[in-house]
Amino acid sequence: MGKYINILDDLTINKIAAGEVVERPSSVVKELLENAIDSGATQVVVDITDGGKKCIKISDNGGGILSSEVEKCFLRHATSKIKSIDDLFDLYSLGFRGEALASISAVSNIEMVTKTKEEMIGTKIVLSGSKIIKKEPVGTKDGTTITVKDLFFNTPVRAKFLKSTHAETINISDLINKLAIGNPNVRLKYINNSKLMLNTPGDNKLISVIRSIYGKEITDNLIEVDYEDEKIKISGYIGNCLLYTSPSPR
């Protein structure tokens, strides 16, 4: 007997699609942190609890989102970064697909508080498993704060595949360090279980970020690289002969 073909409902589609975007807590941090940077933020705070499995909170002072547009953020393929395929050839943002918030909201409890400088009052929206629970005006400063709680609460099978809290924290820390190095113009503060882990100055100097991450001893033993010709430009830092990693014992 032949099998019937089922047309999946939007909720099921979002849960399946979330697996491609949200693999673990570090995936959530990556998408939200990149969104914050793309918003024009100069200051971003990342605050996680229990390796991001319990709570991920990211606040920025970027452009914010208009109250009339807030609900659209959580629709699949809804983005402010492109309008047509032609825009891809002149794209400088970190993301553009418009899948992140839809995927994250499908497998978590999420709250967004946002305000643009053009509006007198901000907007708060709360979703659980893609469903809008509440939307209301709220007093807040310019920018956006997104809080993601109980990741994979409605997909327990996926929650079982998460690593230990320590391992998930290491993944998040590594990701944040890389994004901090790539965006020295952004003051990035990273808090893990109420402990300050990183606080970059946002002075647009790569060496300042390196010092914040690796400390003074390593920074003092770096050599600046700066090369440019007609086709390529290379800049950065390499370690001198005093920096090395001991080989692992055999």
Descriptions of predicted regions:
Residues 2-246:
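N-terminal phosphate-binding caps/lids of nucleotide- and nucleic-acid-binding domains
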Residues 248-250:
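Positively charged, low-complexity/disordered segments
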